[in-house]
């Protein structure tokens, strides 16, 4: 049973990363954490730092058995709609019984609107 569950999680990560590759050229999955960015850091990993002085688009997701934790969505490029596109990809890839965890809400109301628009999911805001 454990192998089946792990395979399902891998498939979900794979499915989401495939869809995200249209937005983020650099994606890496390490120990159930997906890192995606428009640029690489000095070590060659996707740069997902919130405090980066470089203009970038970045995303960090953590996958658990029946949940996805959104650790960060960063868009310092000035382009509009990144968060909405990321959420469209995530919501179209998961089952309704999944829990979506918002790690830190510094969005000035974005997450409240998403939660209100999609009450069929189980949301947790930290």
What is each PLM-predicted segment?
Residues 15, 19, 23, 89, ...:
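Charge-rich, solvent-exposed alpha-helical interaction surfaces
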């Amino acid at each position: 049973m454990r192998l089946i569950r792990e395979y399902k999680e891998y498939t979900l990560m794979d499915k989401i990363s495939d869809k995200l590759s249209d937005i983020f050229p650099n994606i890496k999955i390490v120990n159930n954490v997906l890192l995606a960015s428009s640029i690489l850091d000095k070590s060659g990993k996707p740069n997902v730092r919130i405090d980066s002085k470089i203009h970038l688009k970045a995303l960090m997701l953590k996958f658990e058995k029946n949940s996805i934790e959104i650790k960060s969505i960063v868009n310092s490029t000035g382009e509009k709609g990144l968060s909405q596109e990321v959420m469209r990809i995530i919501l179209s890839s998961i089952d309704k019984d999944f829990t979506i965890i918002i790690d830190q809400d510094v969005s000035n109301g974005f997450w409240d609107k998403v939660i209100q628009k999609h009450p069929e999911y189980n949301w947790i805001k930290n």
